UniProtKB/Swiss-Prot annotation:
Protein name, entry field: Protein TIFY 6a
Motif interval(s): Jas: 343-367
Coiled coil segments of this chain: none
Function: Repressor of jasmonate responses.
Organism in which the protein naturally occurs: Oryza sativa subsp. indica (Rice)
Pfam family, one: Jas_motif
Major subcellular location class: nucleus
Stretch list, region Disordered: 1-33, 293-327, 360-427
Stretches with biased composition (Polar residues): 293-303, 317-327, 369-402, 411-427
Gene Ontology BP terms: regulation of defense response; regulation of jasmonic acid mediated signaling pathway; response to wounding
Length: 427
């Protein structure tokens, strides 16, 4: 039935003629009113075609006759767009072309641009032709989404309302891929929102097997703490060790003023006197060293005499030292400080040992011999033979009771308790 109607329209076009057709186009372009009569009788097909009638150019109507191009046109069309029909009298279009014009695709932009040149601007066609490139973006990848959307996406459809005042078409807000408002923010750094995170910082300190976490620690405070920790990790100089021994040195100075060099010897080796005192390998050598000690140092403290054996080889024996050589003061002071380093139990055992040795010496030789001290020192060197002049040697190093016992016996050398003994041992 379409073919018969198409043929009827073709015959009436030939009868109308081309000048009349051009005059109709000029009348339509002159802004004619919408109340115009349709010159063809209203049939079923004609009524259906007139409802969807739109403006077309002659070149577009010629291309509609090609079936291949029409198939491509229908394939890429958007069915949502319905342009308002504004027919003009004497406009000779075929009904089949009007049925196919219900939808328009990418060719529609060219058709409406051509129709806009003929003066059909009051129906919003020109505005759509200008805005069409924005609604149909090119398939070039956008900076945020590398995969473009398809052109047949329903989000890209543009709908028009023919009843809007002013005759301008109504277009929905389409979704644009590169829109800055509705664009995706995946992978985009949000600067203002993340600027507050560096202010809330935490500091973790591992100390003494504990983990300490502190909040809101600025960078300057953390650097200051690390600087203090680095200073504390440096080993202390040797002067700190000397300061720690200051109470001991003060006590030693109260007892003996010259005790500073002797104190260092005692602190370094406090246990050196234990094996030498307990051993009885050379007791006479120890006693022979005590001969040159002054009387005041031995009588000032009762226990100074027995503890004088704590210095094993600090003083040379009488056989090696000259008669006029005095003993250093540090050695005498060390003998006075030595009881402080020895415990009380060892002090008692040492006192018992010295008493028994004194009894053995007095029982072997109760009377002193007339030999010189130099000759007696030769016999002192041998541990097997006891010395006969041991009473003279032991007397200064013992306590007061020993002095009274030995002073009652006849001696060649006499010591006075009021004056220090002389270093000359000649008769």
């Amino acid at each position: 039935m379409e073919r018969d109607f198409l043929g009827a329209i073709g015959r009436k076009e030939e009868a109308a003629g081309k000048p009349e057709e051009h005059s109709d186009y000029r009348g339509g372009g002159g802004g004619a009113s919408a109340a115009m009569q349709w010159q063809f009788p209203a049939t079923k097909v004609g009524a259906a075609s007139s409802a969807f009638m739109s403006f077309r150019s002659s070149a577009a109507a010629a291309r509609e006759e090609d079936p291949k191009e029409a198939a491509v046109f229908d394939r890429f069309s958007l069915s949502g767009f319905r342009p308002p029909p504004r027919p003009s009298p004497g406009d000779a279009f075929d009904g089949a072309a009007a049925m196919k014009q219900r939808q328009f695709g990418f060719n529609g932009r060219q058709q409406y641009a051509a129709a806009a040149q003929h003066g059909h601007r009051e129906q919003g066609v020109d505005s759509y032709g200008v805005a069409a490139p924005h609604h149909f973006p090119s398939p070039s990848p956008s900076p945020r989404h590398p995969v473009p959307f398809g052109h047949a996406n329903p989000m890209l459809r543009v709908h028009s309302l023919p009843n809007v005042a002013g005759g301008s078409p109504y277009r929905n807000q389409s979704f644009s891929v590169g829109n800055s408002v509705a664009g995706s923010t995946v992978g985009v750094y949000g600067g203002p929102r993340d600027l507050q995170n560096p202010k809330v910082t935490q500091m973790t300190i591992f100390y003494d097997g504990l983990v300490n976490v502190f909040d809101n620690i600025p960078v300057e405070k953390a650097q200051e703490l690390m600087l203090l920790a680095s200073r504390a990790s440096i080993p202390s100089p040797p002067s700190a060790a000397r300061k720690s021994d200051s109470p001991i040195s003060a006590a030693a100075k109260l007892t003996v003023p010259e005790a500073l060099p002797a104190r260092q010897i005692v602190v370094q080796k406090p246990e050196a006197s234990v094996p030498l005192v307990s051993g009885v390998s050379n007791p006479i050598t120890i006693v022979s060293q005590a001969v040159t000690l002054p009387k005041s140092s031995s009588s000032s403290n009762d226990s100074a005499g027995p503890k004088s054996g704590g210095l094993p080889l600090a003083v040379t024996p009488l056989s090696q030292a000259s008669p006029s050589q005095p003993i250093p003061v540090a050695t005498t002071n060390a003998s006075a400080i030595m009881p402080r380093a020895v415990p009380q139990a060892r002090k008692a055992s040492l006192a018992r040992f010295l008493e028994k040795r004194k009894e053995r010496v007095s029982s072997v030789a109760p009377y002193p011999s007339s030999k010189s001290p130099l000759e007696s020192s030769d016999t002192i060197g041998s541990p097997s033979t006891p010395s006969k002049s041991s009473c003279t040697d032991i007397t200064p190093s013992t306590n007061n009771c020993e002095d009274s016992l030995c002073l009652g016996q006849p001696r060649n050398i006499s010591f006075s308790s009021q004056e220090p003994p002389s270093t000359k041992l000649q008769i």
